Swiss-Prot record:
InterPro entries: Cytidylate_kin, Cytidylate_kinase_dom, P-loop_NTPase. It holds the Pfam family Cytidylate_kin. It comes from Streptococcus equi subsp. zooepidemicus (strain MGCS10565). This is Cytidylate kinase. Keywords: ATP-binding, Cytoplasm, Kinase, Nucleotide-binding, Transferase.
Length: 226
């Protein structure tokens, strides 16, 4: 049975991470949250008051405090910068609102893409982000691009934030998500777009379990054919 690589891309709050984690568990695959890597770089920038021209300082701290992932007792994924658990810190609104400019820095993308490709070499991995199918893993055996309305994505993020205890205004979230869509799809380096051979799936009004089933069936078919 061949171990394949699955790329799931899409805009903010399209369900990428939730779906990817479930499928990874079902298939016994490794899940790599690339968004958490860019959020970690953003956290470094904000914590130190760095700006675009300080990219080398961000890279230096990433080298000194490498990003790693560990499993919590409940099976959830923890994100570390060096020995610091930043799982909750990188999900705060200030990081969310600044991750677009940090992730658009060519030097940051080059370094993190290098790390992502190294992790994916052995296969049996599911990776989600915005440029996995186009840049990170252009030869992935299965590429999915998830979309959903801004209204629905704002509702999902609102619910997530409430559950995490993050103060959130729904209308502000809608505005922020629409603004991030524009930034992500218009940046010069690795803009958000579907790969030519990606399956585009609109998840508006679709349950998580239905999305998981759709993607997992596609994956299992490819695995069985390999």
């Amino acid at each position: 049975m061949k171990a394949i690589r699955i790329a799931i891309d899409g805009p903010a709050s399209s369900g990428k991470s939730t779906v990817a984690k479930i499928i990874a568990k079902n298939l016994g695959y490794t899940y790599l949250d690339t968004g958490a890597m860019y959020r970690s770089a953003t956290y470094i920038a904000l914590k130190n008051g760095y700006h675009k021209e300080d990219v080398n300082l961000i890279l230096q701290e990433l080298a000194e405090r490498p990003i790693s992932f560990k499993k919590a007792a409940d099976g959830s994924q923890l994100v570390f910068l060096g020995d610091q658990d930043v799982t909750m810190a990188i999900r705060q609104n200030d990081v969310t609102n600044n991750v677009s400019w940090v992730s658009a820095l060519p030097e940051i993308r080059e370094e993190l893409v290098k790390q992502q490709r190294r992790i994916a070499r052995t296969g049996a991995i599911i990776m989600d982000g915005r440029d996995i199918g186009t840049v990170v893993l252009p030869d992935a055996e299965l590429k999915i691009f998830l979309i959903a309305s801004v209204e629905e994505r704002a509702q999902r993020r609102y619910q997530e934030n409430i559950e995490k205890g993050i103060a959130t205004d729904f209308d502000t979230l809608k505005t922020e998500i629409a603004a991030r869509d524009y930034k992500d799809s218009h940046r010069q380096v690795s803009p958000l777009k579907a790969a030519d051979d990606a399956i585009i799936f609109d998840t508006t009004g679709i349950t998580i379990s239905a999305v998981v089933q759709f993607i997992q069936e596609k994956a299992e078919k490819i695995i069985d054919m390999a």
